[in-house]
Amino acid sequence: MRNFIAASLIAADFWNLENEFNQLKQTNVEWIHYDIMDGHYVPNITVGSCELDSLINKTSIPIDIHFMVSNPDEIVPIFVDKYKSTTVVNITVHLETCNNIGKLSRLVRKSGIGFGLAVHPLSLIHI
């Protein structure tokens, strides 16, 4: 398994994204990590698909989307359909919020996008 260096968009200057991306091109950053937070699963609210459209148009760096939302089974298919032929290379969802991980994983991977699971540090997992 290969590791990637991903720069989190949440730390970027949103008023100057193009310059931020130009600076990233001079580094070893291989992915841009894009957090989508809904204010329910986590208390913060971040950007959505309109901002992601702008991001895709400003950089060719591959994009990793991390969904911190309470309903990924509903939201992720919309994003997959919209972004399957773009620079989005990976989608990560939280184990605790998925109703059908297998179905969601198959949908994402069938589109050619990688799929990952995140786990809340306090969650108990039985294997």
Label every PLM stretch briefly.
Residues 109:
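Anion (oxyanion) recognition and catalysis
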Residues 125-127:
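Conserved small/polar residues in nucleotide/adenosyl-binding loops
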Residues 1-89, 96-98:
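Conserved N-terminal beta1-alpha1 strand-loop-helix module at the mouth
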Residues 106:
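Catalytic pocket-lining loop regions of alpha/beta-barrel enzymes
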Residues 93-95, 118-119:
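Short beta-strand elements of ligand-binding domains
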Residues 10-15, 113-123:
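Active-site glycine- and acidic-residue-rich loops that bind
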